[in-house]
Amino acid sequence: FPKTDYDVDIYADNYIGIYDNLDNSVVDYEYLDESNYPFYHVDSDTDVLSPYFNLNEKKPNIVIILVEGLGRAFTNKGAYLGNWTPFLDSLSTQSLYWKNFLSQGGRTFAVLPSILGSLPFAQSGYLGMGEKMPNQLSLLNLLKHNGYETSFYYGGDASFDNMELYLRRNKIDDLIDKDKFSTNSGLLPETNGFTWGYDDEALYAKYLNTRPSDSMAKPQLGVLLTVSSHNPFKINQQQEFYDRFEERMTQLDFTESKKQDYRAYRDQYASILYTDAMLKKFFENYEKRPDFSNTIFLITGDHRMPEIPMATVIDRYHVPLILYSPMLKRTSEMASISSHSDVPPSILRLLKSNYQLDLPEDTSWLGKGLDTVVNFRNIHQIPLIQTKVNMKDYVVGTYHLNGDRLYEILEDMGERPVNDPKQQKSIMDAYNGFKQKNAIITNGGKIIPDSVYIKYTN
């Protein structure tokens, strides 16, 4: 097993220590031409992930698993609804684990542009722009430019919410959705004649059976989006996971009264237990492949499942991020806040530091990169979009603006209302600045110069 962060050499140049008075001041960008390219800025070369890795000579495979509805409220130790993911909880102790992580959307439509492209929302989500999506750089096209083979696997219909269009525009090599599954085995049960598609077990099997594992293959970037834990939460092994639901409540020492309350959401919790069990099976099978030892896995939720009542506004976006790899030389649990948009810059900086990737010096990333400080803080400005017609949330430091209400985010990611007109005005000004930039994109503005796009996508 990798070492924990307590084994770290605190005198290493790139070690970020634990301090009593952490700085929550927000880091800003040096923009280059805001009127023409509102998000285009000088990129940072700060690589915070390399100190955790012993990487191999060959570029690593990257596997990103986006789990439908996986909220922190019921995931891992400390979850306020109880820990319903025993496998993920175990995996997180062998990983880099961000427990105070945020998705940037309240629904699935926001996840691909955020975690692959670190993009703004435009009017109703970046994907909502359809054919008018401006050219941009992403993990997909930048890694393809650097010799990677890219793929997307989804048990449902990838044309939903223009996901397929976005992926094609990012030059995806292989796109596998429900039309590419050759059997009905694994189809989720129909509800009123409708099924979302194939369950997690079938999705993971499809990935393992169709991705190359030999050492001569190109390095892989694989993105998987699950659907089993989506409303209406009907799964194929329904009774088995109803039984596991009852067993789990007993393991969690629930009183009979509390059990009765939770039974109102039996389908939801059963689907979470199923999701966790299928992830366990996926890793057990992947471990048998020769490429397992050279793979970096990222697991996160696309958003928090809203069908189980939420405790706060921020709860809708509170998801885990687990970064696991056999190449990790130490583990860490981070209480600092980061978001989906921080993933692309950090992954690319890790690879650039170790494999001299050909990447632009200037970028349009919304996120600054993952924060690896273990104590609670937030150095990011994080816009959030709950639905395609509801963009009113903005996080700056440990404050969360929700419309005309201001909340302080607490160390357990709870929040409390605060009355601080000066702070509220400051955050509102920052949010208005983001919305002005975002409106330029909505109205046909560009993300990056054409010359940069052409150089790094050919």
Please provide the spans of the model-predicted regions:
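N-terminal secretory/membrane-targeting segments
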Residues: F1-P60, S92-S95
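His/Cys-centered metal/cofactor-coordination and adjacent catalytic loops
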Residues: L49-S50, E57-P60, G71-E149
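Substrate-binding rim/cap in mid-to-C-terminal beta-strand-loop elements of soluble/periplasmic
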Residues: F109-L119, A311-Y355
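Catalytic-site neighborhoods of secreted/periplasmic enzymes
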Residues: L112-T195, N231-E240, E246-R248
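Active-site His/acidic residue clusters
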Residues: K180, Y207-D267, P306-I308, T312-V313, ...
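Phosphate/adenylate-binding glycine loop and adjacent helical scaffold
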Residues: L359-N458
